[in-house]
Amino acid sequence: MMKRQDAIRGLGGERAFFKAALFRAAGAAALATVSTVGPAQADMAAGDLDEVTVYATRNPIEAFDYAGQVSVIPKDVIDDFNPSSLADIFDAVPGAAIGGGPRRSGMTPDVRGLSGEGVLILFDGARQSYLSGHDGRFFVDPELVRAVEVVRGPTSALYGSGALGGVIAVRTITAQDFLDEGQRAGVKVSSGYQSVNDEWRMGATGVWRSEDDKVDVVGNFTIRNSGDIELGSGLDLEADDEILSSLLKTTFRPSEEWTLSASWMRYGGNSVDPNNPQGNNPAGPGNENVDRDIDSNTLQGNVNYNPATNLIDANLVGYFTRNTVTEDEIDTTRTVSREVETFGVSLDNRSRFEAGPASLTFTYGGEFYRDEQVGRDNMTADMTRGGVPDATAKFYGAFAQAELSVKGPVGLFTLVPGVRWDRFENDAVGEPSTRDEAVSPKVGATWKPVPQLLVFGNWGQAFRAPSFNEIYADNVHFQIPNLSVPGPLGPFGPPAFVTNFFIPNPDLVPEESETWEVGAGVDFENILFDGDSFMAKGSYYQSDVTNLIDLEVNIPFTCFLTPDQLFPGAPPCGSGEAFGNYSRNVNVTNAELDGVEVEAQYDSAYFWLRGNFATIDGRDVANDDYVGVLSPDMIFLDGGLKFFSGDLRLGARVSIASDFNKVNDPANARDGYTVGDVYAVWQPMSGKLKGLRVDLGADNVTDADYDVVAAGVSQPGRNFKATVSWRQGF
């Protein structure tokens, strides 16, 4: 018998043309720490819709001007969500979501129907390569985050393997975020509570800047402690956890040309929950309760050289990450662990040219990174862990991209062709090595007939190399009862068990995609009031994805037959490949994914409204079955009123989902839902209380019982939230 799992885990106007000098000043150093604004400016940024994207083209541009879809969620919007985890903010991003359920330890992202190895995660440019069948991937506390970029669509032309569905890039806080002009030191302290899981949070940030502005330092420490999650269904989801997060970052500017920075970020999590923390999986035989310890460290160094010449704007980044998850079974002596280390270095440069009405930015560079994994299980003879091979992967890449803009009588045209070459190698002890390479081209184009209108399109190819987990998976996968024979204690005792083993497959080939996208956007200012703005951008995309990697699980059907149900010639039930009782990753499916995404934002001195819409469909080309991490049609709205020159903001959010019937098994269909949140922010911008911020709110105000499709469990119920913070500069 074969059980088949899901095959795929898987806004700027003409004025941007004149801002080229400003973005050049930001330069490639923005890949690690983008150009910043002081806290007084950031506090008023709730209406600043001209967010800058760093990762969409590796060259800072306004997100609106990108020839595709990218969302930039800035610090002020993140803070208004008063998030417990980064998953809380993803309603603000069309076409992207966090699945795996409400437990922090099981949250995984998906973008445009792809997840797992199909989505690249970057922390300040450092790749986060930790991947597990059931564990989460977001080892970062929201308190440390100054912006999140979600580039949707294939981006292998810049980032290589893994950017099949898109890139989620997290940018962490800097000292500049906390200091006004002339201030040399500052502190921020905060404390918060939310009722749905009885979570308390405390955090402290300290910053310092030298008299000559050449050196600055920022440090943060945050602790969260929470209990079980109260679901909208009325049930509790076991999820006791404690999170300790810290960040230390320093920047040195010896001259106007040079910027050097270094950082260390740590995420430590301890929780008591089932071995598989995703969905509504209860603890029990085969999914024992574990004391889970997460230790994630990211160290990074960055050097930017940006002299007066237009030919050099170079950025060198080196990083090391270590992510270790250890699980001690509560009721046994078994301990298992997975450790993934990544060392990487990238070098890129931007050369800029201008000739009359034309300008060209040529971005080019190379990258190398190495992943190494070690799995341990103290209950196996050789201490190795089933499904977690001791293996290494190496990636070498070189890329080039041109951004050519020409301003003529019919508007501004921009053409952005790019290409990247990658070579990748996988090795494991006692197994054959694998080698392959890929070329990933992409081209995007935009046209602005007038400054307020943008028309764009793009085409690109992307790939996702097979991971060492998929190629070299071996040892025990799971055990099942063998009902076809009496148990060791006879017919009235417990059954005998047989073992399903992983089988390596060195013949896997990369997943590949070809995507095209077309869209348009509008950008207006001074519509109803002086200084107000409205932006909207939408697109339709279609992706053809081939060679999808799927885990095939084969079990002899006779294992489920009693002795009196057996018939002559029936294959025996046993353990391993000899009996057909094995699991193996194979290339099995070609899929077509398509969808629509729309974002719109309005802001004024009196009120704001932002929202988005997304729909997606995914089909198996061979049999028309649904494939991918699909979701219902989604509408998200976030709006509110501003009082006392913005010192007080009252807002509300609503998420609306249609009925979900894009399923192969009717049992997996889900009803639609409408969920609303309310919130208030008091943040005096002047006077003696400047620096104080009070956040009050309630999520899921109606205590709705609803399921997010990719979560597999009812979502958290009504959740009252409160946070108080104070910031002072000196």
Which stretches of residues belong to each language-model region?
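Short loop/turn motifs that connect adjacent beta-strands in outer-membrane beta-barrel proteins
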Residues: 44, 159, 175-185, 211-214, ...
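Flexible loop and strand-edge segments within Gram-negative outer membrane beta-barrel domains
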Residues: 226-227, 232-233, 237-243, 257-314, ...
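Gram-negative outer-membrane beta-barrel transporters
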Residues: 349-351, 360-362, 369, 406-408, ...
